[in-house]
A protein has these predicted regions:
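Transmembrane alpha-helices
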Residues: 283-291
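Single transmembrane alpha-helix segments in multi-pass membrane proteins
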Residues: 9-14, 22-79, 122-135, 274
Length: 291
């Protein structure tokens, strides 16, 4: 798979006379990959527990169209009527907008989170407690939410939305801040690798030679610095979606490795029956995974 990917990259580089490997193009590819990676992070516990979610793309589309609808049709009139004094244009974190625009974006995020929770509650209840196969439930959700997108939008583009909301998905972090973050990430990588090595020694696990752990940390650090110095700072800086992806990944890693719920997920995925006989509420695990 890796060899095939490298061959494809080389082919596109030859076809485009090297444009494929320019920072601007790689930056756009990383942004698109980050959005998919955020969805993939949420899919990991679903797959680990032996389930599936075919509706994730349709759910994202449905929630996105609800947010756009609220931003275009509901929030401007609602906030403009309640806070007319906040309609004046101003600058917020370097973005030209109004305070009502900032409030609108905050409300949109709340709406998106609530909508996602409701979908998760619905799917989780049907799969975990009513014992309907996940394939059937999420396939139905795939079709239903795709239809919901057409119902809400009427098949038309809903725009424009607030600049602050656009900035979350399309904005960049200043290059100097991105470089500082990269140095911090590299430091955290080495600390994490060495801490993990000490933990293995503490609990009696076999340890690899120290140079292997250092090479592992160095390889990860090299990838991080290459991304920041060549791809990100070679264009406009680190993309906001990439930063969000990293934050979500750190939170997810902590939950799965350092919490009871995370260990329950892996226990369920390893042996469902043994997990149930151990007194763990397996239905609740599946329910939470879909939320």
């Amino acid at each position: 798979m890796v060899i095939a990917l490298v061959v494809i990259w080389i082919m596109f580089s030859i076809i485009t006379d090297g444009v494929f490997f320019e920072p601007r193009n790689l930056s756009n590819l990383v942004r698109q990959t980050a959005l998919i990676a955020i969805l993939a992070i949420g899919m990991v516990p679903v797959i680990v527990t032996g389930n599936i979610d075919l509706s994730v793309g349709s759910v994202v589309g449905f929630i996105s169209i609800i947010v756009a609808y609220c931003q275009y049709f509901i929030f401007p009139d609602f906030l403009g009527g309640m806070f007319p004094s906040l309609e004046a244009q101003t600058t917020f974190l370097g973005i030209q907008t109004s305070m009502n625009g900032v409030i609108s974006t905050a409300l949109s995020i709340v709406v998106a989170v609530i909508a996602g929770l409701l979908v998760g509650l619905w799917h989780g209840t049907l799969i975990a407690y009513l014992k309907i196969p996940a394939f059937i439930v999420t396939l139905g959700g795939y079709l239903a939410f795709r239809g919901g997108v057409l119902l809400v939008s009427g098949g038309r583009t809903i725009s424009p939305v607030e600049n602050t909301l656009v900035e979350i998905g399309q904005g960049y972090i200043p290059k100097n801040i991105g470089l500082i973050l990269a140095v911090l990430v590299v430091a955290c990588v080495f600390v994490s690798v060495m801490w993990g090595r000490n933990q293995k020694f503490k609990y009696g696990f076999e340890k690899y030679p120290v140079y292997r752990d250092l090479l592992k940390a160095a390889a990860i650090s090299a990838i991080v610095m290459f991304y920041v110095l060549y791809i990100a700072n070679g264009y406009e800086g680190i993309q906001n979606p990439v930063l969000l992806m990293v934050i979500i990944l750190v939170i997810f890693t902590y939950i799965t490795k350092n919490t009871r719920f995370g260990r329950y997920i892996y226990a369920y995925g390893g042996n469902k029956e043994a997990t149930r006989l151990s007194g763990i509420n397996t239905s609740l695990i599946v329910f939470k995974v879909y939320i």
